A protein has these predicted regions:
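Hydrophobic scaffolds flanking metal-cofactor catalytic centers in soluble metalloenzymes
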Residues: 1-200
């Protein structure tokens, strides 16, 4: 009942395209949260979170991202900043990224969209004042993308090497998480088949 009300409120309060993306994402989040996972997967999800926050802390003072989309065609240019945020929500929150978020603590209540009056231009969480998600609840790829403009700014600040090293750590950890997560999904699929064979 509560999920039906939640969907109705999204459809009433948001542009249809954003509401559809949010409903699908929240459904996938609930499905992933219902999975039984092992301690290794949960520990790696928390490590992905820690490494993502470490990268984000280095990017906190950058100014490039506030105006990078100015003058770009729609949907990229709908807002001044966040050119790299103009992707499709389901692509940004792919299966592995969403699983890492869920098992590090992200819940449906953490996925708050911009006000409904704000145009849906790319990711469902992109609005005129930036992303509505706290960094902890954004996919790792949201801090992983370094465009040429941002790279130049980081180089001028003397931060580029440090940020690239932290991104490499994040990437390695996400690859480890993905391997463990995919192995868990394989077990989920194979377990009933193996049980059926063994009980014959």
């Amino acid at each position: 009942m509560l999920i039906a009300v939640e969907r109705l409120l999204l459809k009433i309060g948001q542009p249809r395209s954003r509401a559809d993306e949010l409903i699908a994402l929240r459904r996938r989040l609930r499905d992933e949260r219902a999975r039984k996972i092992d301690d290794d997967e949960r520990a790696l999800a928390r490590e992905v979170l820690a490494r993502k926050l470490a990268v984000s802390a280095e990017l906190d003072a950058v100014s490039s991202c506030r105006s990078c989309a100015t003058g770009a065609p729609w949907p990229r240019g709908a807002y001044d900043g966040g050119d790299c945020c103009a992707g499709v929500t389901a692509d940004l929150f792919d299966e592995n990224e969403l699983a890492a978020l869920v098992h590090a603590g992200t819940r449906v209540r953490d996925l708050a969209p911009p006000p409904g009056a704000d145009e849906h231009a790319g990711c469902a969480f992109r609005g005129p004042r930036g992303c509505t998600l706290e960094v902890a609840h954004r996919p790792g790829r949201c801090v992983h993308y370094l465009c040429d403009t941002l790279r130049r700014e980081l180089h001028a600040r003397g931060q580029l090497d440090l940020v690239e090293a932290k991104l490499a750590d994040l990437n390695r950890t996400m690859q480890q998480f993905t391997q463990v997560h995919q192995a868990g999904l394989d077990r989920d699929v194979l377990a009933p088949i193996i049980d059926a064979i063994l009980t014959r």
